[in-house]
Amino acid sequence: MSNQDMIYIKSKENEYYYVRNDEHKYEVVELLYNIKKNIFILRDHLYHNKNRYNIEHHPSIDQLYNNLHNVSISETPPNTNNSSYTINKGQEIVFCVRSKKDGNLHDINLMMYVAIHEISHVACPELQHTPLFKKIFTFFCDEAIKLNIYTKIDFDNNPQECCGININNSIV
């Protein structure tokens, strides 16, 4: 499979997603749609309730809200070694939604952890996994748990493979 085997598929909600053109393409579109819906629920909740949070969180909430508007969400191409990543602080988020071990789709909860990680990069003015990034990621995970769009996974005691990466510690 090459990048030529990627295709735009329209979701039931009339949004297009760039996914692998295989037997799982409609499942992937549904998964990506649900990820996008949930990150917008989190983004909007944080922004509209900003004054409830410590002022130290206001810059990251504003940056997330301002940068994450017309985000393009897609699946990683089959011939890449990349996992999930963000381009231009929210212009595009590309998700690896399949296990590198067996090719099965990851479940929505694990993908929400990955999505929260990626939008934490969007909200953080610094690059890499700095202390500020980790603070933002922790805050976003805590809020996503409260909103019931993510259920905490105890990676410390139950490591999980996600796109070939072993996640073995929890931010929350």
Language-model regions, residue ranges each:
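Active-site-proximal or metal-binding-adjacent scaffold patches in catalytic folds
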Residues: 1-112, 122-172
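Walker B catalytic acidic pair
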Residues: 118
